[in-house]
Curated annotation (Swiss-Prot):
One of its GO terms (biological process) is intermembrane lipid transfer. This is Protein kes1. Keywords: Lipid transport, Lipid-binding, Transport. Belongs to the OSBP family. The keyword Transport applies. Lipid transporter involved in lipid countertransport between the Golgi complex and membranes of the endoplasmic reticulum: specifically exchanges sterol with phosphatidylinositol 4-phosphate (PI4P), delivering sterol to the Golgi in exchange for PI4P, which is degraded by the SAC1 phosphatase in the endoplasmic reticulum. Pfam families: Oxysterol_BP (PF01237). It comes from the Eukaryota. InterPro entries: OSBP_sf, Oxysterol-bd, Oxysterol-bd_CS.
């Protein structure tokens, strides 16, 4: 197995530095085209120079890039302690998922839309002698949806979920509504934590340096009765700070006053205190998101990967893009996309459907619906279940 981070760490970078002066006019033309587009922006073909050489399917690895936190979740002695640990682990996933590329390269890049059936698998080594394993599959292309399953058998920690998105242009921003939810299972305690996702806003478009800000709320709802509500906000024209994170933990069953408050930046320092003692001296460090380094995922070398594994699918495109040869990159991308269109035509002609390898859709997730009753409106939503 070869080691590399699951994000754009090893493959995006040099192309960024060559980008701005040579492609500024093309960038502005692209912005004008999306400003007049009324549908879901994910269906648009983006020019190669704004693309990442990493497929969106790899983003599922961000959930476990701090494997020591992931496997430690069952160690909390009480349901409340475990709720706090799960909240800390979730907060640790945000920076790399939404901000690391901008900090590393100076601007956000559009990840590649995975092809239907695309796979990304790998594992993290841990100090308990059992690997944490990831399996992710692109289960839908229109709309794009990735299903994923992350498991450490010895620790008894399992995460499964699916992410899709719908995006639209609004003024100077692109808003991305994340579709789906995740379920974190702590097997030693027979607990399930249902996780929803924040709104993603792409800022800085007209300056040619796009970056991500998070908005609205997301929730972590435990079958033990505890609820974490996280509110995200960013810097406005006159007020606010970038990447603001404010959370409360309550017992949703008893509808008590909040027990904990957690505040700070999801790219910097988070502090917490009990709700009863909110004096400044009572706030303690919760998580230093800015200096919490991710752990690389191990993936098979490209030459050992199957034909649908992500880095093999996009190998030629990535080589061309990293060399700054945007014409060749566009040609390679078009070749892949046309091959997919031909497969769909053949399936339609022979009245066939694509069969998913690892996941199965069910129209109901009754546990999620029951858990979200503690919110103002319960959420009725299906789920992509992992085929064990």
């Amino acid at each position: 197995m070869s080691k590399t981070t699951s994000s754009d760490d090893s493959r995006d970078g040099e192309g960024d530095k060559r980008l701005r002066s040579t492609t500024k006019s093309t960038w502005l033309s692209f912005l004008k085209s999306i400003a007049t587009f009324s549908g879901d922006l994910s269906s648009l073909t983006a020019p190669s120079f704004i693309l990442s050489s990493t497929s969106l399917i790899e983003y599922s690895a961000y959930w476990a890039e701090h494997p020591e936190l992931f496997i430690s979740l069952p160690r909390g002695e009480t349901p409340l302690e475990r709720q706090l640990l799960v909240t800390k682990w979730f907060a640790s996933t945000l920076k790399n998922q939404y901000a690391a590329r901008n900090e590393r390269y100076g601007s956000e890049k559009k990840p590649l839309n995975p092809i239907l059936g695309e796979l990304f698998t790998g594992k993290w080594n841990t100090d308990i002698g059992e690997d944490t394993e990831l399996t992710s599959e692109q289960v839908s292309h229109h709309p794009p949806i990735t299903a994923y399953h992350i498991y450490n058998k010895k620790a008894g920690v399992r995460l499964e979920g699916y992410n899709g998105h719908k995006s639209g242009f609004s003024g100077p921003q692109i808003h991305v509504k994340q579709i789906g939810h995740a379920r974190l299972i702590l097997e030693p305690h027979n607990e399930v934590y249902y996780i929803t996702f924040p709104l993603v806003t792409l800022e800085g478009l007209w300056y040619g340096s796009p970056y991500i800000e998070l908005g609205k709320k997301s929730y972590i709802i435990s079958t033990s009765g505890y609820l974490t509500t996280i509110e995200y906000s960013g810097k406005g024209y006159f007020t606010g700070k970038k990447n603001t994170f404010k959370a409360t933990i309550v017992n949703a069953k008893t509808k008590s006053e909040p027990i904990y408050r957690i505040e700070g930046s999801w790219t910097g320092m988070l502090k917490y205190c009990t709700f009863e003692d909110q004096k400044r001296s009572a706030w303690e460090d919760f998580l230093d998101c800015g200096n919490y380094k991710p752990v690389n995922i191990s993936v098979a070398p490209i030459e050992e990967q199957g034909e649908y594994e992500s880095r093999r699918v996009w190998k030629n495109f990535a080589v061309a893009l990293d060399a700054g040869d945007y014409a060749a990159a566009s040609q390679e991308k078009s070749k892949i996309e046309e091959g997919q269109r031909e497969l769909r035509r053949q399936e339609e002609e022979h009245n066939e459907v694509w069969h998913r390898k690892y996941f199965e859709w069910k129209d109901k997730d009754e546990g999620f619906e029951e858990a979200t009753k503690c919110l103002r409106q319960p959420v009725k939503e299906g789920f992509w279940y992992y085929l064990r």
